[in-house]
Amino acid sequence: LQSVLPIACQDDPLSTFYLEKEFETRHTYDLYRQAERFDLIHAHWPTLAPYFSAFTTTPTLVTYGYIEKELHEYYRAHFPQCLPVCVSQAQRKMLGDDSIPVVYNGIDMNEILFNDKPEDFFIIVGRMTPGKGIAEAIRIAKKARVKLLIVGHVTTHLPWSEGYFLKEVKPHIDGDRIRYIERLPYREIVQMMSKAKGFLFPLQWDEPFGLVVIEAMAAGTPVVAYPRGSMPELIKHGETGYLLDSEDEMVEMIDRI
């Protein structure tokens, strides 16, 4: 297969939300146009593949990065040839369908260097959305009087992403105690995670998986998180991180790390 675009949408400054959806559709169409060449099509996002799967005998496997329960039920009813996979037990429970197999996400351990000599700062990595808990991480870091590095992309054509950043995050960035980097290559992100004393993850939603959590743990960085979504499946409390119920508990734990 070949890309239908010369550059990834997220790296194209001229890209818009509507162009991204157009190119996503174009890419999926180009794939299914050649479906008979393959034994299996594996889709990592569920919005388009189920519809195209109805026009081929080649089976489609869809890994649910995230999906609403109502949408899953619609796919089950109308596209039985499309086989879903959940990324955590928590996600399967949220969908209310015990028949879905669970296959956890993985990472390339060769890309991540373990570091047992951290520097004096904490980190949070994630999209600039309220659900990731970045504003809460800032508040926790300030209460604990520790330095925090934020790495997270602002999606400028989505008002709620840019608005969240401008209102809840940007006013706190001082370049010293609270630092912010919008974009970094993957290797540099995991390097920064490995240097951090801890990874703060006060989620405000039920995260189906959370790749950054296992990336941080692989780098030797303990994760301090709320026990929401898949976090209890990924983190062994007291061994690979800490599952806590409040900001005050997180502040207290930070003092011990």
Feature annotation, model-predicted:
Residues L1-I257:
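Catalytic cores of nucleotide-sugar-dependent glycosyltransferases that transfer UDP/GDP/TDP-activated
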